[in-house]
Amino acid sequence: MLHISFLGVAQHCHILKERENNVLKKSPIYSSHENQIYLLDSKIEINEQLSADICHMVLNCPEIAATAKPGQFIHIRCSDGLSPLLRRPISIAMADIDTGTIEIIYRVVGEGTKILARKKKGETLDIMGPLGKGFPIPEGIKFPAIVGGGIGVAPLLFLAKAINTANKRETAGIIFAGFSSDDETFGTFFMEDCGFKLEICTDDGSRGYKGFPTDLLEKYINDREIENDTASVNSSKEIIGPMSPHVEIKAGGKNAIDIIYACGPKPLLAKVKSIAAGAGIPACLSLEERMACGVGACLGCAVKSAEGGYMKVCKDGPVFEASQVEI
């Protein structure tokens, strides 16, 4: 533990030194072929309350807006003092190169986010990012499913926009979004504007389906299998002779899901992983873990790898292929 703490302190001191040398020049404190990380004082353009404990903030930071990818996050220093000492990791809900802004949606749950909620337009925040590995968008995907729960819906807005831009199709895919109640829903109009069919769930039934988004995901996949099963049997008789309908299903059908993206609490991610594995559909999961350093130094966010050992959510993730991690 002493060794890990020393690494965290050393990394923090290194960042402070780099900040003095580089931030005024707006150059990245870290750069690789995959990512550039900036440490910036970012001006708050908007900080508004969406519901009782959910807030939306817009930050002016052209460097991060130009390089951020869906699924990545920023590390925010909430206070100039020592309390809270650690930065808060918050996913990027949107990035706009034209305006040079990024957006975050956060839940007020502790000291750090309470301080964030009190910040005013025109104030600045010390932020580091973009951090982590985001969602892959493979070429050739035809009908992705996006599954989000609670505040985990936030980074999926950015993903929906990116998929819409890449696909340029009338129907980009389907989104299953779960919230506690209608009062806590957000981003719904935007998701529909991105061309996605939207299914909303609430725990109390105040809007949409009463239950979990994974219930609807499972039902959707099962319904498509039944439809494609019938279609495959009919076509096999006419064209190619007897063949297992199961093979035809794997080849896809109308609006058959070919990849699943998910972000939310662990029970949701575990269920998505199980559903995807059973249906033979690849899935990418964005994990939520407490983070201290945000750059892989302190090992505080380690999760078990499916192949043995551990992986760091902040650096190796937060997005992983479902088969890579144990949940």
Q: How should each PLM-predicted stretch be described?
A:
Residues 29-121:
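Ferredoxin-reductase
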Residues 38, 310-327:
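Short, basic/aromatic-enriched C-terminal tail that caps enzymatic domains
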Residues 111-285:
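FNR/FR-type flavoprotein reductase catalytic core
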Residues 266-267, 288-317:
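Local cysteine-cluster metal-coordination motifs and their immediate loop/turn environment
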